Regions:
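Conserved Radical SAM active-site core
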Residues: 95-123, 128, 132, 168-292, ...
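Conserved AdoMet/S-adenosylmethionine-binding subsite of the radical SAM
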Residues: 223-401, 405
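Auxiliary Fe-S-binding modules of radical SAM enzymes
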Residues: 11, 15, 20-167, 328-337, ...
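Short, charged, solvent-exposed linker or helix-capping segments at domain edges/interfaces
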Residues: 185, 307-308, 436
Length: 438
């Protein structure tokens, strides 16, 4: 949704008969507001401010005794502007993480280098608006906070250990600094039941799904820390942290709707990726409607080898391939690219026969411009000492074979390995001690 479309939606909602509130004496208004707040509190728990769309937030602010109109469009926009920049909308005195950049996502999509934005002047919400949020029975606080942060100086990667307010569970998200931009890797579950042989999170086993509020809290924290640390613009977002996104599809779908809204978190869907091992063809079919780029963590192109690496997988690679092809066909033409990911392991899936098998898997179902193969050298994990990453020479040879087969192919550099923040390493010792270890 564009910013203009969002504004038109806000105006339409506020102009509707449901948004009309007849003039009543001030005392009566306050009494009614208190009664309505009490009823709302009884009927349903509050939602985090991060998961309330601007048009709904405008109506909610309009219910406050401090409201000047029944639909507070401008105040809702100021709240979301603060959220987008990493400010705390409940704290009008938040000093703001003033250094850093915001940048233009359009320019970044076109490959331009974006200069740093001017330093901010503090929070974007007034004390009045902060009070309106604080006293609302329907608006809840941000659902998570950073428990600990660690830094890999060699790569500039920063891991945030995030404690969830609901039950104290821990998840991780990672800020990855590139040359002219920053990427954020977020989690969708506590633990993961897919049990990939090379993944530390899979070793934790199944914990629980994250709520929409908890997913979006990671996004907000990423924006907040990127600004505090004066990182390049945070414009890339990937669901490649803890958990299998398609096993928590309803929450991931709802979170993505706000992540990619121009008047909410304002990430481009071209720069937002949902990565999955594809639990089933049905999961993949449902994935097609997501406002994000799709990525398939295939890891091996033959069933025998893939089931050793992903032991919970019960569907053939051909079934899953056809499901991805159908999902892409249902999307708009400009969103029909699939990223195919392989975690390369020495002597396991990095040979010439593995490259040929991948080409033979992809070629019948996809055109050249639909596929980007991304090779990820495995990062070491304590529970699988016999597995190690493919050598640079093996990765380059695999890449050349894929190029010769007619598909684009990149080799991802490892980042965050020193701080156990790289792909496959997102597992918290505290969570393992809490009983998620099999």
């Amino acid at each position: 949704m564009t910013a203009r479309a969002g504004l038109l939606l806000l105006l339409a909602v506020c102009a509707s008969p449901l948004a009309f509130r007849p003039a009543v004496p001030r005392l009566a208004t306050r009494a009614s507001a208190r009664h309505a707040a009490t009823q709302a509190e009884v009927e349903s728990p509050p939602r985090s401010v991060l998961s309330i769309p601007p048009e709904e937030l405008a109506l909610e602010l309009g219910r406050s005794p401090l409201a000047s109109r029944p639909c507070e469009t401008t105040k809702a926009a100021s709240v979301w502007h603060a959220i987008r920049q990493g400010y705390d909308p409940f704290d009008a005195d938040d000093p703001g993480l003033r250094s850093g950049t915001v940048g233009s996502r359009v320019a970044l999509e076109e490959g331009a280098t974006v200069a740093a934005a001017p330093a901010g002047k503090g929070n974007f919400v007034s004390r009045r608006v902060a009070t309106m949020l604080e006293t609302s029975a329907r608006v809840g606080p941000i659902a998570a906070a950073v428990e600990h942060e660690s830094y890999d100086a060699a790569s500039g990667t920063r891991k945030l250990l995030v404690r969830l307010r609901a039950d104290g569970a821990l998840v991780e998200c990672v800020l990855i600094r590139m040359h002219a931009r920053t990427s954020l890797c977020v989690s969708s579950q506590v633990g993961c039941r897919m049990a990939c042989a090379f993944c530390a999170t899979g070793r934790m086993g199944e914990g629980r799904d994250l709520s929409v509020d908890e997913i979006l809290a990671q996004v907000w924290l990423g924006r907040r820390y990127a600004r505090r640390l004066a990182l390049p613009p945070l414009v890339n977002l990937v669901f490649m942290g803890m958990g299998e996104p398609l096993n928590n599809l309803p929450a991931v779908r709802e979170a993505l709707a706000l992540i990619t809204r121009a008047d909410a978190f304002d990430f481009s869907r071209k720069l937002t990726i949902v990565s999955t091992v594809a639990p089933s063809p049905q999961h993949v079919a449902a994935m097609g409607a997501l406002p994000a780029k799709l990525a398939w963590s295939v890891h091996a192109a033959t069933d025998a080898k893939r089931r050793r690496l992903v032991p919970t997988q019960s569907h053939s690679v051909f079934e899953l391939r056809d499901a991805f092809a159908a999902a892409l066909a249902a999307r708009a033409k400009r969103h029909r690219q699939l990223v195919v990911e392989l975690t390369l392991m020495d002597g396991v899936n990095d040979g010439a026969d593995d490259a040929r098998a991948l080409i033979e898997l992809l070629r019948p179902a996809f055109s050249r411009d639909q596929i980007l193969v991304n090779l990820i050298p495995m990062n070491s994990v304590a529970h699988a000492p016999s597995l190690r990453g493919a050598s640079r020479d093996a990765a380059r040879a695999f890449q050349r074979a894929i190029w010769d087969g007619g598909f684009l192919c990149t080799v991802r550099g490892t980042k965050g390995d020193d701080e156990a923040a790289a792909c496959g390493q997102l597992s918290t010792k505290a969570a393992m001690r809490a009983g998620f270890s099999p």
